[in-house]
From Swiss-Prot:
This is Methyl sulfide methyltransferase-associated sensor. It comes from Methanosarcina acetivorans (strain ATCC 35395 / DSM 2834 / JCM 12185 / C2A). Residues 40-77, 209-246, 469-540 form the PAS domain. Residues 117-169, 250-302 form the PAC domain. It comes from the Archaea. GO terms for molecular function: histidine phosphotransfer kinase activity; metal ion binding; phosphorelay sensor kinase activity. It catalyses: ATP + protein L-histidine = ADP + protein N-phospho-L-histidine. It holds the Pfam family HATPase_c.
Length: 998
């Protein structure tokens, strides 16, 4: 039996008929072929490998008729949606016969018992020669709804065909074939292998692209002229590659341009013809228009992309613009738009119109929804498709005709966009720059895009509504000033928190939700929170205090109001936690204020204490009130160049083990702690160990500083002391600055008061001694006069002469002058103490009114007339009679200039000169009082207007300067918003300047 089979196989493989077993798929791929295929120049491998299908060797001019007859036979769309030829049975039924399909599309005996048929057509051998064959086709297998495998038995009838056919018959056959080719959908080309691929032959159905065969065969157009510019390089590369690899056949897809400029997709299948030398003679191929398939693929792709953007939550504007852009890419030359319906206004507004001329879109935007209101308005109003092939003639376009003409719009097609419930959402509109109506596939294109736009609009609107609702809730949730926490009653972590929690704690929301609740709640509150959670579950609500730990470790005190709520279908505890940091600070501040007031009261009551007791008390209270571990106090010299360390706090002295402690610190060489003097303001350093270019380092065994605060203590504008504290557990802040400043200013005022009282006692004692001395001299004079009046009581030689009496008078005058000097000093001290007391009590009042300054100056000179006369001073005044009035307190101004003139007289020698000059300047009156005294050292000038100033560096020595009243003078000028300054050079006299606003 095996031998018989082998003989049979040998007979078949060597017989005259070549047998193919083909699959009913695109290109008719070959499952097997007999070995005698070598008759046609091929090998079985050429087909079985998939390199060639049976359809590839059919002569191009015969391919369509062979396909159509096959379709007619199997009575089914064999190619279906898989075959690139896109030629279906319905297109050929007129030629192939009016066969009807049965219900399942079966073949065979349902066709009347015939299970095979015969065709005659031409094949191409491998060298490109044409062979006439007779092919018997028999279906061997079937699948449900389509053919499976079929057998093709091919006989070479070329010789018989040539013998049988006479020339006329051959001509008739050729004409018939041409007719079939020219009337089919497959365009046949014959190209020369030259640059540009000139065309030797093209079928007449090239007219489907708008061209004539003569356009190509005449040489006016070469084939590369119609290939889309973006695809030309790829096509050239593909042809070159297949040519170099020695292939005889290849296929490719690309775009070509119709004569109108319209883009078409084609599938080209090409045979490469070579001569005996292997040189390429020509390219023979067919073009199949696959535009419809490509557009369907692109439409599906664009729909998927639009749907992806919808699903990703893109905005409606973005989705509609994407949809319109894809539509315009698929159909170049069409201007696509989407208009959205505003139900309240009953108008259409553009959602996307990227290519529509702005002049037209601006005019149509907001068009009313009604019949005869432009194409889109009519479509929305009627809910039906509106096709306008010629805008210039259609009644629907009367309102927009003129503008459309200006921008070159000639046709318009509008499709209503519906929701799933059938409501009109808008209109998908296409504008053209040519007058025509849409083709069938374009109508489907419009409908599909309108449907997709409806999905997008409805989805986005629904998503927007949901998002808006969620946003309203989230906005309220996140913008409540309190911290909001949601957790399950027995949950160990939080289900949700608001943005305030995120902002205040410094964690991301994800971090907070992944943390245990007790990682956020400080440990000191754990027991209290657990207890309150149990009470909330039992009672439903609870108010209690707790805290939250920030990412940086800071604890925020909270007042928690918690209750049971339903959240997302779950029973949860909703906690409204109010930050009570400010309240806690206020409580602390209140306690501090109480402590500060207590400290200031105690300080005020220490008038009888020693300087050491006062400074020690102030320093230790500064440490206590700021919560510090250490403190110090240093006094400044008169020139603000050197600090003298007065004392350290007890705690600092316990920690410090420096053997040779430094007490005198030049400001220039001081480190970071000297910035309070250099910058003349409080300096807070909450990270003292951090590198700082201003730090000079501290000695071995010095107290280690972590945090530091120091302040300058002012007397007027002059720094008189520096106080500092350090190593507070928390950061220093402005509250600490305020505590330290108030305490140290109180200390300094007490020191001043003690020094003034001491000066008062000293001057009082000196005045008493001067008074006793004066009384003693008076007694001596009385006794002497009595002896002169009663000479009998003494011998002549014992009587004193008048020279002795004159000496007694001189001594008496000296005592009187001394008494007057100390009396005047005492008066000024008392006046100054009184002014300081009134200033401290806030009882110095000013009464501002229009005042004649020349009258004030006249009164001031009158008050000093006796002093001027005693010194026989020459006075010169330059005051304009038309001097402007100023707004001031006449009494205070009189006191001001009386004191300044008194000061000038004091520094002017006997018989010297005193000058007054008053001049008006822009917005001010400038008064200058000059004397011819010896002048004052420049080093003392900056301190003349201080309440006190040092004459040496000892804090215990007396201060001078208040007696002069210049401090009071400056306060009066400041109250009038004026300026006062002093100019002097030793030996050249003094100039006192005052500027007062008009």
């Amino acid at each position: 039996m095996i031998g018989v089979d082998m003989k049979l196989e040998t007979l078949v493989n060597n017989g005259p008929a070549v047998i193919f077993l083909c699959r009913a798929e695109t290109g008719w791929p070959v499952e097997t072929v007999t070995a005698n295929i070598v008759r046609f120049g091929y090998s079985p491998k050429d087909f079985i490998s998939g390199g060639l299908g049976y359809a590839d060797i059919i002569y191009p001019a015969d391919l369509e008729i062979a396909v159509s007859q096959f379709f007619s036979y199997v009575e089914k769309d064999y190619i279906g949606k898989d075959l690139d030829y896109k030629v279906e049975y319905r297109e050929y039924k007129g030629e192939a016969g009016e066969h009807k399909r049965n219900g399942k599309g079966n073949i065979g005996k349902d066709r009347g018992g015939y299970d095979s048929f015969t065709q005659q057509y031409r094949l191409l051998n491998k060298s490109g020669d044409v062979l006439w064959v007779e092919a018997e086709i028999k279906v061997l297998e079937e699948e449900e709804g389509k053919a499976g495998l079929f057998q093709v038995t091919v006989f070479d009838i070329s010789r018989w065909k040539h013998t049988e056919k006479a020339m006329p018959a051959a001509l008739d056959t050729e004409n018939e074939l041409k007719r079939i080719i020219n009337s089919g959908h497959v365009i046949v080309f014959l190209w020369r292998a030259e640059p540009g691929w000139p065309v030797d032959f093209v079928s007449e159905n090239i007219s489907e692209l708008g061209y004539t065969p003569e356009d190509f065969t005449s040489g006016r157009i070469v084939y590369t002229d119609i290939i889309h510019p973006d695809d030309l390089d790829n096509v050239r590369a593909e042809v070159s590659k297949n040519t170099e690899e020695g292939r005889d056949y290849f296929s490719k897809e690309y775009r070509v341009l119709a004569k109108s400029g319209e883009v078409r997709y084609v599938d080209e299948r090409t045979l490469i013809r070579r001569n005996e030398k292997g040189e390429i003679t020509c390219y023979q191929g067919i073009l199949l228009d696959i535009t419809q398939r490509k557009e369907a693929e692109e439409l599906i792709l664009s729909q998927n992309r639009v749907l992806e953007r919808i699903a990703s939550g893109a905005s409606l504007d973005e989705v509609l613009l994407l949809l319109v852009n894809y539509a315009e890419e698929m159909k170049p030359g069409l201007l696509c738009t989407v208009m959205l319906l505003d139900r309240e206004q009953k108008r259409l507004f553009y959602g996307a119109c990227p290519s529509l001329p702005k002049l037209y879109s601006k005019a149509i935007n907001g068009i009313q929804v009604q019949v005869n209101s432009e194409t889109a308005g009519t479509a929305a109003g009627t809910g039906k498709r509106v096709i306008v092939g010629n805008i210039m003639k259609d009644p629907f376009c009367e309102e927009c005709r003129e503008i459309a003409q200006k921008v070159g719009l000639k046709a318009c097609w509008a499709e209503p966009i519906f929701s799933s419930g059938g409501e009109v959402l808008g209109v998908f509109t296409i504008y053209l720059r040519e007058t025509r109506k849409p083709r069938e596939e374009e109508l489907e294109f419009i409908r599909t895009n309108a449907y997709l736009a409806g999905i997008a609009i409805e989805h986005v609107q629904a998503a927007d509504a949901l998002k808006e609702s969620e946003n309203r809730f989230r906005t309220i949730f996140d913008n409540i000033n309190d911290q909001l926490y949601i957790r399950e009653p027995d949950g160990i972590s939080y289900m949700d928190v608001n943005q305030v929690v995120v902002d205040r704690l410094g964690y991301s929301k994800e971090e907070i939700l992944n943390m245990k609740a007790e990682e956020i709640i400080p440990s000191e509150y754990w027991a209290s929170v657990r207890e309150n959670m149990q009470k909330i579950k039992a009672e439903g609500s609870r108010i209690f205090e707790a805290g939250a730990v920030c990412k940086g470790g800071t604890v925020i005190p909270l007042e928690v109001s918690a209750r049971i709520i339903d959240y997302g279908g779950k029973k949860t505890i909703f906690s409204v936690s109010r930050d009570i940091t400010e309240r806690k600070k206020a409580e602390v501040a209140q306690r501090l204020n109480g402590s500060r007031l207590e400290a200031l009261v105690k300080l005020d009551q220490m008038a009888g204490a020693s300087l050491k007791e006062i400074t020690d008390f102030a320093r230790e209270e500064a440490v206590r009130l700021t919560g510090s571990k250490l403190g110090y106090l240093a006094f400044m010299d008169a020139y603000e160049s050197t600090l003298v360390m007065h004392s350290w706090s007890d705690s600092a002295m316990e920690e410090c083990s420096i053997e040779d402690k430094q007490f005198v610190y030049p400001v220039k060489s001081m480190g970071l702690w000297g910035e309070a003097v250099r910058q003349r303001k409080p300096i807070i350093t909450n990270d003292y160990p951090a590198p700082n270019p201003l730090k000079k380092g501290y000695p071995k065994n010095h107290v280690h500083l972590i945090r530091h605060l120091n302040i300058p203590v002012f007397d007027g504008k002059r720094i008189v002391a520096v106080a500092g504290v350090g190593n507070k557990e928390e950061n220093y802040d402005e509250s600490d600055v305020r505590q330290l400043t108030l305490l140290m200013q109180g200390m300094w005022q007490l020191i001043q008061r003690k020094q003034l009282e001491e000066a008062l006692r000293t001057y009082s004692g000196e005045l008493s001694r001067a008074n006793e001395e004066l009384r003693s001299v008076n007694m001596m004079k009385t006794e002497f006069v009595e002896e002169m009046m009663f000479p009998e009581k003494a011998e002549y030689g014992e009587i004193m002469d008048y020279e002795t009496l004159y000496a007694i008078d001189s001594q008496q005058q000296k005592a009187v002058n001394t008494f007057i000097h100390y009396s005047e000093k005492l008066r000024r001290l008392v006046d100054s103490l009184l002014y300081q007391s009134l200033e401290k009590a806030g009882k110095i009042d000013y009464s501002f009114e229009e005042t004649q300054l020349k009258d004030v100056l006249s009164d001031a000179f009158l008050n000093n007339v006796f002093l001027i006369g005693e010194k026989a001073l020459e006075v010169k005044k330059e005051v304009s009679a038309s001097l402007s009035e100023i707004k001031g307190d006449r009494e205070k101004l009189t006191a001001l200039f009386t004191a300044l003139i008194d000061h000038a007289i004091k520094f002017t020698p006997q018989g010297g000169k005193l000058a007054l000059e008053v001049k008006e300047e822009a917005g001010n009156v400038h008064i200058v009082i000059a004397d011819s005294g010896k002048g004052i050292s420049k080093e003392l000038i900056p301190y003349l207007f201080d309440r006190l100033y040092q004459v040496n560096d000892s804090i215990t020595r007396r201060y001078q300067g208040l007696e002069s009243g210049l401090y009071i003078c400056k306060n009066i000028v400041d109250a009038h918003k004026g300026e006062i300054w002093f100019e002097s050079e030793e030996g050249l006299g003094n100039l006192m300047h005052v500027k007062l606003p008009k």
